[in-house]
From Swiss-Prot:
InterPro entries: Ig-like_fold, MOSPD1/3, MSP_dom, PapD-like_sf. It is found in: Endoplasmic reticulum membrane; Golgi apparatus membrane. A motif (Nuclear export signal) lies at residues 205-208. This is Motile sperm domain-containing protein 1. GO terms for biological process: cell differentiation; negative regulation of transcription by RNA polymerase II; positive regulation of transcription by RNA polymerase II. Widely expressed. Shows highest expression in ribs, and slightly lower levels of expression in heart, kidney, muscle, thymus, calvariae and lung. Also detected at low levels in spleen and liver. Gene3D superfamilies: Immunoglobulins (2.60.40.10). It comes from Mus musculus (Mouse). Residues 16-143 form the MSP domain. Induction: May be up-regulated in response to cell-cell contact. It is a multi-pass membrane protein. PROSITE patterns: MSP (PS50202). The chain crosses the membrane at residues 159-179, 191-211. Plays a role in differentiation and/or proliferation of mesenchymal stem cells. Proposed to be involved in epithelial-to-mesenchymal transition (EMT). However, another study suggests that it is not required for EMT or stem cell self-renewal and acts during later stages of differentiation.
Length: 213
């Protein structure tokens, strides 16, 4: 007797929920960003019901805050910010998407999406750039501090090889260029333009290395 294949029972709250994006940023000076779209994906072989909850529902309008997603399909959820005021700048709100099977009420999974209102996209880019610079400086200071004791133990200044290479590069740049017929320097000491460019590049690297010591 052929038995019907049963779907395994799903544990409440453990089902992964796939939403994109996971962060919404609204800019007060850009009205086109006042409407954002969340995409909910259903990669499973059964249909899902969904519901959108919010920590501050008075600030947002959610189009189709509840509905269903067919198996292996997706649905777009439109979210509009309707209270764009300076007092809300930087405040983090949260949306929660709960999903369940169509035949049941218990939530199988949930996913939180944060939403933030910022005054301007340009200010946001500036803050991110300043943050990157600050992180870079912090990393470089840490690197120098960790290497200073070893550097002091090895030498207190540039090595003799570095100084010698620097002198050679300076001398190479002072030599005449190929084609300079009025020079008193022997022809075999005339350097090409490419050779002088290489010498200048190496001299620049040496100068940077000396300045860091």
């Amino acid at each position: 007797m052929h038995q019907q294949k049963r779907q395994p029972e799903l544990v409440e709250g453990n089902l992964p929920v796939f939403v994109f994006p996971t962060e919404l940023i609204f800019y007060a000076d850009d009205q086109s960003t006042h409407k954002q779209v969340l995409t909910l994906y259903n990669p499973y072989e059964f249909a899902l019901k969904f519901k959108v909850l919010c920590t501050t529902p008075n600030k947002y309008v959610v189009v189709d805050a509840a509905g269903a997603v067919k198996p292996q399909c997706c649905v777009d959820i439109v979210i509009r910010h309707r209270d764009v005021r300076s007092c809300h700048y930087g405040v983090i709100d949260k949306f929660r998407l709960q999903v369940s099977e169509q035949s049941q009420r218990k939530a199988l999974g949930r996913k939180e999406v944060i939403a933030t209102l910022l005054p301007s996209a340009k200010e946001q880019q500036k803050e991110e750039e300043e943050k990157r610079i600050k992180e870079h400086l912090t990393e470089s200071v840490f690197f120098e501090q960790s290497c200073q004791p070893e550097n002091r133990a090895v030498s207190s200044g540039p090595s003799l090889l570095t100084v010698f290479l620097g002198v050679v590069c300076i001398a190479a740049l002072m030599l005449p260029t190929l084609g300079d017929m009025e020079s008193l320097v022997p022809l075999y000491l005339h350097l090409s333009v490419n050779q002088k460019l290489v010498a200048a590049y190496i001299l620049g690297l040496i100068t940077m290395a000396i300045l860091r010591t």
